[in-house]
Amino acid sequence: MSLRSFASIALVLFAAAQAAPAQQSIPTIGQLDGAPFASGLVAAPTGGTVAWVLNARGVRNVWTADAAGGQARMITRFTDDEGQDITDLTFSRDSRILYFVRGGGPNRAGEVPNPTSDAAGAEQAVWRVGLDGSTVGRVAEGSQPTPSRTGLAFVRRGQVFWLADSATKQEAVPMFRARGAQGALRWSPDESRLAFSSNRGTHAFVGVYEPAARRITWLAPSTDTDGQAAWSPDGNRVAFIRTPYERHRMLFTPERSGEPWSILVGDARTGKASTAWTAAKGVGSVFREIVSDNQLQWCAGDRIVFPWERDGWPHLYSVSAAGGTASLLTPGDGEVEYVIATPDGRRILYNTNQGDIDRRHVRMVAVDGSAAPVSVTNGDGIEWNPVMTAGGTVVVTRSSARDPAQVARVSGERMVALAPSTIPADFPSAQLVVPRAVTFRAADGIVTHGQLFLPPDYITGARRPAVIFLHGGSRRQMLLGWNYSSYYHHAYAMNQALALRGAVVLQLNYRSGIGYGMAFREAIGYGATGGTEYRDLAAAGRWLAARPDVDPKRIALWGGSYGGYLTAMGLTRDPQLFSAGVDIHGVHDWNVGIATFLPDYNPLEDPAAAALAFKSSPLSTVKSWKAPVLVIHGDDDRNVRFIETQTLVAALRKQGVHVEQLVFPDEIHSFLRHASWQGAYTAALDFFARTIGTRP
């Protein structure tokens, strides 16, 4: 499409949008995406304090509260949208100090994120702050703070360092040195030993370091990948997960079965280990990691709790540390996430979508399976990241269709926000659209879920523009409310902005995403093996086009990462159906995308697979692309290489497609600065107003 013809169409659509019924005080994207995002909730080992990170329009700070009802307080004082993340909140053993990491991790060149292009550079460092708000300060360059009663262990550039007094300016010293990249530090209960993982690239070991003897003991080293160490309560044994090495393991391809993974229990003194449990062959033989600080929980009664999807759903199971048959703890269709043991080690808290497939609620179950799980939260909200204080109070992070993520205390059937004043006065909660769940069937019979947003001034039969949002991942799920991921928290605000500007908006949970079981997640032919998830997008587009309230000539796409891939697929595979797109850091050639995560990937080793990967990519059919597109990318993206967007833009230029660009120097994949999100979404809203006639 020529620039002149595109401009003419845009002018007509803009005029039509201006002639539409006026809607008073449409919230700005600044108001909608100005909702704060709470994350990283943790409970102190003693007392009733909880802590979390609050990102308020790019300004990140640590907050604490007495879970029993005390007033929440901000205990750090960062003031700018600097793009420096705060993660790894960790209490000291006496619960008086909070450690955290400020700044992102390095890329393969060793560069840490510097999204403001600060001439002085940036760093990733461990910080500490007293719970009374005193002694806020940098401790040392590094990450993964792991305090003991006598000092602080942490990781710097793949090695473990030690600081006896984190409150002074003394230099940290290497605790020990080992080949590879060390991480996942875990003190034994008596703090005499430190378990850690040692990643050697093709394999990984679990080691135990004994400071008094200055000795490393490797636990049954093998050619496989070991990790996820969990100490026994007596401090003599370490449980860990072993996943078998496979030479030609590929990414972005379905993996329904493989060589079974196992749980081993090792002697911390001798390094000898025995197998406590091994997955059965077939479904569940491939390890499926869940959202949790540790995949293994060594609990009371010498029971080890772990995730397994033997029946096609990620569930929790329990097995004796001595070995035996595993007991299913969480039966039913649905997935478990954010798993944590209660302080007494007798129960497990987790969130799940069982019984409410497009939301999350918290449940609790006994580690021995002696009783069925009990609901801790329910209703039309979304709850995740549960913790329990030493006094037994349960605290969660929660949201709903109209309320963004906040930390709340569970009080019977109610949830009480701990910091309600953090919601901005101009946040337009009452004006937000409540999405509804929808399903539709693709041409090959696969049923796909989504959430539909109808504009507040909706009139039956009045044809409107429509927009489909495509999440990234692809191991993600959009929900019936504000998402529990910061990336999709922003995306939900954008979808609300589009609906409030007159568009019918559909969030599509296409195959290969989470939430709907293993068979849906590991869909045959998805990704680099055929791109079958595009069938779900095609079905969604035709479903919208057939609706009496949608103008079939004004259906647009937007998405980031994997969602950018599907946006590009739609504009190449169905140019008559989709009329515009916003492609944010999208994958455009699977061979490039795979090599980003597997640097030694060689397409020549399997030419047929490489050819299929390219055939499954938008660039293979780019000559069919006709619609205008806005591409957005940060050039320090570590997940999708910047060259992916460069290659696409070059191809589209050659064939005269109208392309608009927005590039953020030094920004990474999930934008670190609020200004970047605002810039991206402001540009996207303007682009859609000019191409499909949404209100500006």
What residue spans do the PLM features occupy?
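Residue-level detector of Asp-centered blade-edge/turn motifs that repeat once per structural unit
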Residues: 45-46, 93-94, 147-149, 189-190, ...
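Hydrophobic beta-strand positions that form the internal "hydrophobic ladder"
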Residues: 50, 98, 152, 191-194, ...
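Short loop/turn segments that connect beta-strands within beta-propeller blades
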Residues: 66-70, 130-134, 165-168, 210-214, ...
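Beta-strand-rich domains and repeat architectures in extracellular enzymes and scaffolds
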Residues: 30-61
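Bacterial N-terminal signal peptides
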Residues: 7-16
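A flexible loop/linker signature enriched in serine peptidases of the S9 family
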Residues: 53-63, 78-85, 101-127, 138-146, ...
